[in-house]
């Protein structure tokens, strides 16, 4: 179970590589997260954050976590 700080960190984490490098995980398209789910999320913290974003989008919870986005 993740706490609020971990959810906020995941929402604001910047994708470090790939086609969507530089985008916040919150803004990754759902098909990209589905692809990661099928191929396997990377190991470590980033993989956990991507898996969380997959679950958020899968369950339609974007509006719930959107207020956690930083405006920088």
What are these regions (language model features)?
Residues 1-72:
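DEDD superfamily 3′-5′ metal-dependent exonuclease/proofreading module
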């Amino acid at each position: 179970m993740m706490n609020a700080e971990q959810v906020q960190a995941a929402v604001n984490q910047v994708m470090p590589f790939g086609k969507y490098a530089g985008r916040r995980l919150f803004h990754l398209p759902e098909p990209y997260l589905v692809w990661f789910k099928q191929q396997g999320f990377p190991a470590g913290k980033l993989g956990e954050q991507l898996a969380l974003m997959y679950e958020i989008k899968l369950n339609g919870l974007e509006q719930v976590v959107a207020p956690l986005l930083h405006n920088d």
